[in-house]
Amino acid sequence: MTLLTRIKTETILLESDIKELIDILISPSIGTDIKYELLSSYSEREIQQQELTYIVRSLINTMYPHQPCYEGAMCVCGTGGDKSNSFNISTTVAFVVASAGVKVIKHGNKSITSNSGSTDLLNQMNIQTTTVDDTPNQLNEKDLVFIGATESYPIMKYMQPVRKMIGKPTILNLVGPLINPYHLTYQMVGVFDPTKLKLVAKTIKDLGRKRAIVLHGANGMDEATLSGDNLIYELTEDGEIKNYTLNATDYGLKHAPNSDFKGGSPEENLAISLNILNGKDQSSRRDVVLLNAGLSLYVAEKVDTIAEGIELATTLIDNGEALEKYHQMRGE
């Protein structure tokens, strides 16, 4: 039975099946047509949680058989694929969170389905990505590291053409935030598909995170939003996964439609992020950053409650520390 047949007919795939799939997808010598058929078929099936863990571990082990660890490190990112074309919320959040002293290893990529991915924005900011080997030194000095996915996982470049061909979210969108080269203590992940929240939360637990939040934003975003109830799966320190809804209005933030968060080109997104960090933007765009930064600070144990996290994020922007972190990352 071929791998394609097994993907289409088997309820649960073996770890060996997953390894075969990954080996094909990262091969430079196998044609895009074959990869397209396998990846599109796999992304249409009901993915089992153990399979997602197999995929993540297969990719990590391929590049980092002895995965490095930085105690207390956190990643804040989304799966992408929500087609919202929002500005770079999680990248902006990273500056705020790192300015609180959280060790942030932000793992990002160029855009697949939007106008500007995190790496596109960093290029516009003149902020260099950091190598995996140099990450501890920069974390010690600046508390913030941006690692480009194509640099940390050069094998992923062999998947990019087929992802572009498919033109919609695939299993790789779920995988992206989970393959940080470093073993993380904390993580906050936004997921484009609400039906995958529990799947991702359980996988994050399998990966050994201490605390995490996996969320789906109201009305379809992969960030917490201001437009309604956000769906939250929280991994607690004792290993429990609890789910609940979170509405920004309960924390003193005004309701706003997701359309308020539309971004544009990397140049336009730079202006948006900078005006939030320097305090000039007091609109709902600032509020959505405060909400996501507050959640991140709560996960990273900088505060005891989400409300305190939002309050701390507000202070970090208003007192200039978040902007100072931006300038520090630019070498200024």
Swiss-Prot record:
Regions crossing the membrane: none
Co-factor: note: Binds 2 magnesium ions per monomer.
Binding residues annotated for anthranilate 2, in chain numbering: R163
Residue positions binding Mg(2+) 2: D222, E223
Binding-site residues, anthranilate 1: G78, N109
GO cellular component, one term: cytosol
Residues where 5-phospho-alpha-D-ribose 1-diphosphate binds: 78, 81-82, 86, 88-91, 106-114, 118
Record: residues binding Mg(2+) 1: S90, E223
EC number: 2.4.2.18
Keyword Acyltransferase: no
Catalytic activity: N-(5-phospho-beta-D-ribosyl)anthranilate + diphosphate = 5-phospho-alpha-D-ribose 1-diphosphate + anthranilate
Name of a matching Pfam family: Glycos_transf_3
Entry annotated with the keyword Glycosyltransferase: yes
Keywords linked to the UniProt accession: Amino-acid biosynthesis, Aromatic amino acid biosynthesis, Glycosyltransferase, Magnesium, Metal-binding, Transferase, Tryptophan biosynthesis
MF-aspect GO terms: anthranilate phosphoribosyltransferase activity; magnesium ion binding
Enzyme class: transferase
Gene3D superfamilies from the UniProt entry: Nucleoside phosphorylase/phosphoribosyltransferase catalytic domain
Cofactor(s) this protein requires: Mg(2+)
InterPro entries to which the protein is assigned, alphabetical: Anthranilate_Pribosyl_Tfrase, Glycosyl_Trfase_fam3, Nuc_phospho_transferase
Recorded family membership: Belongs to the anthranilate phosphoribosyltransferase family.
PANTHER family: ANTHRANILATE PHOSPHORIBOSYLTRANSFERASE (PTHR43285:SF2)
Protein name: Anthranilate phosphoribosyltransferase
Gene name of the record: trpD
